[in-house]
């Protein structure tokens, strides 16, 4: 046996946190016992300690077989993660948006996907779904605000893709990133009919702070968006909302308890909460402890978290843009990886 090259150790309040970077296995031991652990990992073949210790470390991947090439294993894991029978296509119907959030990186170019490009996207979808190596097709909507052109772009393209997938016997579903303002009852019905079961919607803090940042020419949007989120969840038990909270120090200090307490209990399991710091404040403001308190409380209320408070590591691809079977088509016909 030999020691894994991906064993890491960190001191923490009289304990040593031990992590294996390949498996994500982690445990803590006292500082007094750490020299013994280091000796075992340095000389694993001496077998001078209890055999159960060696077996436990082997099971946790801290000790590995002599002929195991960990780098080769990681390469294979990555290759397996970017391949597959799923094709993910993101379409941006427009770069326009009805909001003007101060931190937004988009350029809000006016214009929508024209009919010529729309028909070419349909042909592309037909070609992808017909491939024998593709079993599943995910159509995802982004922008700008995609629902600005629901009737012109989303409705015909989604119906076309769904029909083609059903004809070919392939799995089909949709996802969307939207500000949620135009997620009306009619569109929610459409979502149910076309398997659009997951949406990401953002709140920028409590009602006051959100309306200060996310408004339609001064008109508040908080109550309308929150109502749309609840209606979307209630329309289909399979529906999921990734509720992104763009936060700054001001958002955290102002508190969010009232926001999460106001959402009915029965839909909370369908709402996955994802806190993301506004990128212009990264490294400037410190909110770690207060953020952890929010996460713990929100979890107690029955919401699943995207920001899991448990430790985890990436295994395989870092992002869907790493996938081989993926593309992003912009409203003007340009195709991007990211």
State what each model feature region is.
Residues 208-212, 270-290, 308-318:
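Flexible glycine/acidic-rich beta-alpha junction loops that bind and position SAM and/or redox cofactors
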Residues 3-28, 51-90:
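N-terminal [4Fe-4S]-dependent radical SAM core
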Residues 292-308, 332:
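Glycine-rich, aromatic-lined ligand/substrate-binding cores of catalytic
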């Amino acid at each position: 046996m030999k020691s894994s090259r991906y064993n890491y150790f960190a001191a923490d309040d009289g304990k040593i946190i031990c992590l294996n970077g390949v498996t994500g296995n982690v445990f803590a031991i006292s500082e007094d016992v750490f020299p013994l652990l280091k000796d075992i990992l340095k000389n694993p073949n001496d077998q001078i300690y209890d055999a159960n210790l060696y077996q436990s470390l082997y099971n946790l991947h801290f000790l590995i077989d002599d002929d195991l090439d960990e780098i080769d294993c990681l390469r294979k894991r990555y290759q397996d993660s970017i391949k597959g029978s799923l094709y993910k296509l993101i379409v941006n119907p427009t770069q326009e948006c009805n909001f003007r959030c101060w931190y937004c990186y988009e350029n809000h170019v006016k214009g929508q996907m024209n009919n010529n490009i729309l028909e070419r996207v349909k042909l592309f979808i037909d070609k992808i779904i017909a491939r024998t190596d593709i079993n599943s097709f995910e159509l995802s909507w982004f922008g700008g605000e995609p629902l600005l052109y629901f009737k012109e772009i989303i409705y015909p393209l989604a119906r076309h893709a769904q029909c083609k997938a059903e004809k070919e016997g392939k799995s089909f579903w949709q996802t969307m990133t939207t500000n949620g303002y135009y997620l009306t009852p009619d569109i929610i019905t459409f979502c149910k009919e076309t398997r659009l079961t997951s949406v990401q919607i953002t709140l920028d803090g409590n009602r006051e702070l959100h309306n200060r940042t996310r408004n339609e020419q001064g008109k508040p949007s908080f109550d309308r968006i929150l109502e749309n989120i609840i209606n979307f969840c209630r329309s289909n038990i399979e529906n999921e909302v990734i509720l992104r909270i763009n936060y700054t120090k001001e958002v955290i200090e102002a508190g969010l308890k009232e926001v999460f307490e106001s959402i009915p209990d029965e839909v909370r399991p369908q709402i996955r909460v994802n806190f993301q710091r506004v990128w212009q404040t990264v490294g400037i403001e410190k909110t770690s402890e207060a953020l952890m308190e929010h996460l713990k409380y929100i979890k107690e209320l029955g919401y699943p978290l995207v920001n899991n408070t448990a430790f985890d590591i990436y295994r395989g691809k870092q992002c869907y843009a790493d996938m081989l079977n993926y593309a992003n088509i912009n409203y003007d016909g340009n195709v991007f990886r990211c």
